[in-house]
UniProtKB/Swiss-Prot annotation:
UniProt gene name: rpl1
Protein family (similarity comment): Belongs to the universal ribosomal protein uL1 family.
Function: Binds directly to 23S rRNA. Probably involved in E site tRNA release.
SUPFAM superfamilies: Ribosomal protein L1
GO cellular component, one term: large ribosomal subunit
PANTHER family in alphabetical order: 54S RIBOSOMAL PROTEIN L1, MITOCHONDRIAL, LARGE RIBOSOMAL SUBUNIT PROTEIN UL1M
Alphabetized Pfam families for the sequence: Ribosomal_L1 (PF00687)
InterPro entries with a match to the protein in the record: Ribosomal_uL1 (IPR002143), Ribosomal_uL1-like (IPR023674), Ribosomal_uL1/biogenesis (IPR028364), Ribosomal_uL1_3-a/b-sand (IPR016095), Ribosomal_uL1_arc (IPR023669)
Subunit annotation: Part of the 50S ribosomal subunit.
GO biological-process terms attached to the record: regulation of translation; translation
Domain of life the protein comes from: Archaea
Protein name from the UniProt record: Large ribosomal subunit protein uL1
Length: 212
């Protein structure tokens, strides 16, 4: 299937009009024979793309002390201290803004109860509750992995729609990233990719191109 994916990716690039920004490349998977009313058929998985996402991903770290310092050194886009976390609890508008602005959150494990109290109401519904990490850990490997990570989820519709890179990435690398998403489908669905009704690729603003 990789050849078909590469050809579709190439066509999606050709059909996409030039924009004044680098567009993402998306994959859309329509699933058949899946009852999403059953909780066991819904999932929310994180997939590490072998060739990365092609653009920066904004990550916030909630931590104090040494972990906060290491997170800054590791290139975290935002570090939220305990005091700042408590302030966010009083400012729902700002908390929502941060929840929408940052794709992933990481939190010092012993601060998770406070995170749940002050940020849980805005992060929970967005499926962005932080990953807890020990205060003594070096967060750099975790942050590096998250920068290459996308969400693959099925909620109330039997459809997966996720980013797999950017339009300026090599066709083969994009195809390999799509394969990583398909491997998740193989693992999560009873019949794996045999349950694919159709698959499309597209740039952010471009038309869809059918793969299967």
């Amino acid at each position: 299937m990789q050849q078909e994916i590469m050809e579709a990716v190439k066509k999606a690039k050709e059909l996409s009009r030039p924009r004044n920004f680098t567009q993402s490349m998306d994959v859309i998977l329509n699933i058949k024979d899946l009852d999403v009313n059953k909780p066991e058929n819904r999932f929310d998985e994180e997939v590490s793309l072998p060739n990365g996402r092609g653009k920066d991903v904004k990550i916030a770290v909630i931590a104090d002390g040494e972990l906060a310092l290491q997170a800054k050194n590791a290139g975290a886009d935002l570090v939220i201290t305990k005091d700042e976390l408590e302030e966010l609890g009083k400012n729902r508008k700002e908390a929502k803004k941060l929840a929408n602005q940052y794709e992933f959150f990481v939190a010092q494990a012993d601060m998770m109860p406070l995170v749940g109290r002050f940020m849980g109401p805005v992060l929970g519904p967005r499926k962005k509750m932080p990953k807890p990490v020990p205060a003594t850990i070096n967060p750099e490997p975790i942050l590096n992995k998250l920068r290459d990570t996308v969400k693959v989820r099925i909620k109330d519709q039997p459809v997966v729609h996720t980013v797999v890179g950017t339009e300026d990435m090599d066709d083969e690398k994009l195809a390999e990233n799509i394969e990583a998403v398909l491997q998740t489908i193989d693992r999560k669905l009873e019949k794996g990719r045999n349950q694919l009704k159709s698959m499309y690729v597209k740039t952010t603003m471009g038309p869809v191109v059918r793969v299967i």
